[in-house]
Amino acid sequence: MYNSEKLVYKGEKFDSRKELDFYKRFIEPLESDNFKVFLHPHYDILDSYMLGGLKGRKMVYTPDVVIKNSKGDVIHVFDVKNSIQPNKKGKEYTPSVYMSEGAKDRIRLFQSRYGLPVEIVVPMRKIVRMTVYGTTKSIGLHEFEKIDYDIRDLWKQVGNQC
């Protein structure tokens, strides 16, 4: 989020008020022995490389929040955005997500390398809107009061519609 005010809460830095709001309302209540929360972890999405004797830079993706279960499995990768607009055709169609082309590319590279969906989220007054970007079949736009859902269940629903 460009030109956003950087905030600090409990010693952690947040890129925007929306991101902090998402953390306080949806993530903080989950923190326990069963779930481990990671803020702004770095994932390599393109390794460094040699180019005519020069070293090309690696590329990293930094999601806003990653949640792992007690076994250490990643169960959510969240990227907080300012806006997700429903498709005029309905919530089952691809919604409009406003982000830079660079952000879109990084998300696609992350999903390709790690096989994990990046959940694009926007906290609203009472709910959080969520979609996944970059897939050939849209999972649509979903709204949740809590983030206790399993993204794999949504994949199964979409897969059964194919």
Feature locations, PLM:
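Electrostatic, structured charged patches in enzyme active sites and in nucleic-acid/phosphate-binding
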Residues: 1-162
